[in-house]
Amino acid sequence: MSKTAIIFPGQGAQKVGMAQDLFNNNDQATEILTSAAKTLDFDILETMFTDEEGKLGETENTQPALLTHSSALLAALKNLNPDFTMGHSLGEYSSLVAADVLSFEDAVKIVRKRGQLMAQAFPTGVGSMAAVLGLDFDKVDEICKSLSSDDKIIEPANINCPGQIVVSGHKALIDELVEKGKSLGAKRVMPLAVSGPFHSSLMKVIEEDFSSYINQFEWRDAKFPVVQNVNAQGETDNEVIKSNMVKQLYSPVQFINSTEWLIDQGVDHFIEIGPGKVLSGLIKKINRDVKLTSIQTLEDVKGWNEND
């Protein structure tokens, strides 16, 4: 029996013009977009559609924008009936909306706060991230341990696919790794355009504030399992899910293990909902045999709704 997982991308997938094709052209999507505009304390639609002020790349804006786009696409799709859901980092919040753990309005407030806390935690230039290509996890982990000291750390942060491990930590060490990467055996080490050491233990500084903020919202049991970044398995209990979303701030994204867990459960079709095909590309490198569908635009939505 074929099983399906709906999956959602995280930061880095955003682009100017996102969701503009959906607005006023699909009632369900427009409802989500309008709701985001009413709920948030900044002009999210202008930021997503035209971004004249150049704010889309700031994490406190990127996070609600991506959640809103994925949720608008999701609302527009018919006959999905997924067995599981999974998101990459920020994308996990779209999974929580899809599985009815959080209402969209609550989720968009939470990711706005998450972005603000992340942005405030570190002055520009303190923390950063980089993608290490061509080395396995154990080797990257070993390099990180050898570079880290008592007052500066670098750690694996996103275990994306074989040969692609993202590291996170103090910018000085990230810069050192970028410089020394090839001599340490990597094909390349690419710095990422992020403003903080996300998914590293440095993010524990915002744990308390974030935890107390999300406690004010209603968390419900998931309608179908959410495969969580921190433990790479499906969860439905709202307390477990909520606790894992706090840990997610400072824990690595276990994307390889999460994908393999889903395949072990019989999933052979992954539907990526949101801008870009980043996750589909990663999954292809984990398992070439599964079916991949990408839903990014109004045209994709129409194609799905007409055929399924």
UniProtKB/Swiss-Prot annotation:
One GO cellular component term: cytosol
Keywords: Acyltransferase, Fatty acid biosynthesis, Fatty acid metabolism, Lipid biosynthesis, Lipid metabolism, Transferase
Pathway the protein acts in: Lipid metabolism; fatty acid biosynthesis
One Gene Ontology term of the molecular function aspect: [acyl-carrier-protein] S-malonyltransferase activity
Entry-linked Gene3D superfamilies: Malonyl-CoA ACP transacylase, ACP-binding, Malonyl-Coenzyme A Acyl Carrier Protein, domain 2
SMART domains referenced in this protein's UniProt entry, alphabetically: PKS_AT (SM00827)
Enzyme class: transferase
Superkingdom to which the source organism belongs: Bacteria
EC number: 2.3.1.39
Reaction equation(s) it catalyzes: holo-[ACP] + malonyl-CoA = malonyl-[ACP] + CoA
Lipid biosynthesis found in the keyword field: yes
InterPro entries: Ac_transferase_dom_sf, Acyl_transferase_dom, Acyl_Trfase/lysoPLipase, Mal-CoA-ACP_Trans/PKS_FabD, Malonyl_CoA-ACP_transAc, Malonyl_CoA-ACP_transAc_FabD, Malonyl_transacylase_ACP-bd
GO biological process: fatty acid biosynthetic process
Active site: 89, 199
Family note: Belongs to the FabD family.
NCBIfam families: fabD
Descriptive protein name: Malonyl CoA-acyl carrier protein transacylase
Species assigned in the record: Staphylococcus aureus (strain MSSA476)
Lineage: Bacteria, Bacillati, Bacillota, Bacilli, Bacillales
Recorded name of the encoding gene: fabD
